[in-house]
Design a protein with these regions (language model features):
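N-terminal secretory/targeting leader peptides
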Residues: 1-153
Length: 153
């Protein structure tokens, strides 16, 4: 609220109606969902992913420590090597999906912009003074989680 907005959480499948009815003024979801749910029909502007993006979709493959520790060293190495190979592939595919989204929105007449470094820095300062501060105060270990999130490059 201090930043002039409030958060509303809903499934991506409901964002279209939320924007259509005025419940939402903006939304954040995956590039694929922005296209598949035809959100370009409700949006006037899209902030495209780029160097100064505010978020990224992190979709790891998870294995419990108990299971991983139960594997042989050779199996562990194979899984880690496959993960590294998959990371390269998925990063390339994500960029392709981002471009499909950008092209789709431009074709629909939506203004597509990228956040500048100056805009990002201003946003970050506002976030630190409002939502980050609130998160750190109300979530156990929240300050450490924010530090870890900001360390991701």
């Amino acid at each position: 609220v201090e930043a002039g907005a409030s958060i509303s959480s809903m499934p991506s499948s409901e964002i279209y109606t939320g924007m259509q009815t005025g419940v939402l003024d903006a939304a954040n979801t995956s590039s694929a969902s922005f296209v598949s749910y035809r959100l370009f029909e409700q949006a006037k502007c899209l902030t495209a992913p780029g160097e100064n993006a505010l978020w990224f979709m992190y979709e790891p493959v998870l294995v419990s420590k108990r299971v991983f520790d139960g594997l042989t060293e050779e199996q562990q190495k194979a899984i880690l090597a496959a993960g590294e190979k998959a990371e390269v592939y998925f990063n390339e595919e994500v960029r392709k999906g981002d471009q499909v989204m950008i092209d789709t929105y431009k074709k629909a007449g939506v203004e597509v912009v990228e956040m500048s470094k100056e805009d990002y820095d201003a946003w970050l300062e506002l976030a630190k003074a409002s939502s980050y501060k609130n998160f750190a105060a109300n979530v156990p270990g929240g300050d450490k989680l924010i530090e870890k999130a900001l360390a991701v490059k």
